[in-house]
């Protein structure tokens, strides 16, 4: 698979305009990226812009801190799906991961995943690895799998750092099933993206997709 097919072309700035979202969608179609990832308020716009193409629409749930209560995350997910989202990146309750509250974490993931899967959509669970040690990452991997999420994702882009090679290796150490991995946060170059793919990532989240593709052309 070519690099472009791994990229979730991302625009999550709170100041992003509708014109910028439409440009994001045009770029995604031109470069044949896997998806566009936009804020919930822009899902319907993006869905209309890429309708009839292979580009999927992704949005975020409980973003960026994961501190929404489960009922709100479920409502967010339902609205995004109704607006045309095919993929949802949900921030887990990081405080509950750190506290080891398995039932709370697994139940929340499972509830959002069930809504997604009922509509033929996928869910990626963001665990914000910058805030976790290895023990917490192992716990998060277990919860993500138990909740039947499709992906585990490193980062929101709002913490002190994005995903690292060490994070990916840690995921691979503790994931036991078919859960896929998405790397994100600070991925700005072609070499970085390719390295994460070599490590086993199935998706790359980046707002620098065009620059990464143009790097090849130059």
UniProtKB/Swiss-Prot annotation:
It is an enzyme of class 4 (lyase). Its EC number is 4.1.2.4. GO terms for cellular component: cytoplasm. GO terms for molecular function: deoxyribose-phosphate aldolase activity. It is found in: Cytoplasm. GO terms for biological process: 2-deoxyribose 1-phosphate catabolic process; carbohydrate catabolic process; deoxyribonucleotide catabolic process. It comes from the Bacteria. SMART domains: DeoC. It catalyses: 2-deoxy-D-ribose 5-phosphate = D-glyceraldehyde 3-phosphate + acetaldehyde. Keywords: Cytoplasm, Lyase, Schiff base. The active site is at residues 89, 153, 182. Pathway: Carbohydrate degradation; 2-deoxy-D-ribose 1-phosphate degradation; D-glyceraldehyde 3-phosphate and acetaldehyde from 2-deoxy-alpha-D-ribose 1-phosphate: step 2/2. NCBIfam families: deoC. HAMAP family: DeoC_type1. Belongs to the DeoC/FbaB aldolase family. DeoC type 1 subfamily. Catalyzes a reversible aldol reaction between acetaldehyde and D-glyceraldehyde 3-phosphate to generate 2-deoxy-D-ribose 5-phosphate. This is Deoxyribose-phosphate aldolase. It comes from Treponema pallidum (strain Nichols).
């Amino acid at each position: 698979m070519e690099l472009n097919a791994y990229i979730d072309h991302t625009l999550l700035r709170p100041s992003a305009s509708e014109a910028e979202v439409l440009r994001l969608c045009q770029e995604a179609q031109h470069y044949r990226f896997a998806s566009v990832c936009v804020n919930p308020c822009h899902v319907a716009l993006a869905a209309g812009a890429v309708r009839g193409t292979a580009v999927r629409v992704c949005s975020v749930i409980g973003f960026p801190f994961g501190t929404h209560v489960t009922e709100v995350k479920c409502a967010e997910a339902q609205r995004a799906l109704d607006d045309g989202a095919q993929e949802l990146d949900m921030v887990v309750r990081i405080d509950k991961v750190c506290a080891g509250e398995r039932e709370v974490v697994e139940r929340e993931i499972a509830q959002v995943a069930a809504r997604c899967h009922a509509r033929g959509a996928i869910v990626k669970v963001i665990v914000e690895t910058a805030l976790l040690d290895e023990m917490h990452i192992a716990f998060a991997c277990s919860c993500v799998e138990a909740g039947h999420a499709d992906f585990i994702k490193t980062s929101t882009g709002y913490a002190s750092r994005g995903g690292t090679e060490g994070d990916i290796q840690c995921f691979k150490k503790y994931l036991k099933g078919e859960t896929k991995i998405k790397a994100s946060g600070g991925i700005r170059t072609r070499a970085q993206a390719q390295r994460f793919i070599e490590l086993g990532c199935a998706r790359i989240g980046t707002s620098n997709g065009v620059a990464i593709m143009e790097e090849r052309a130059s």
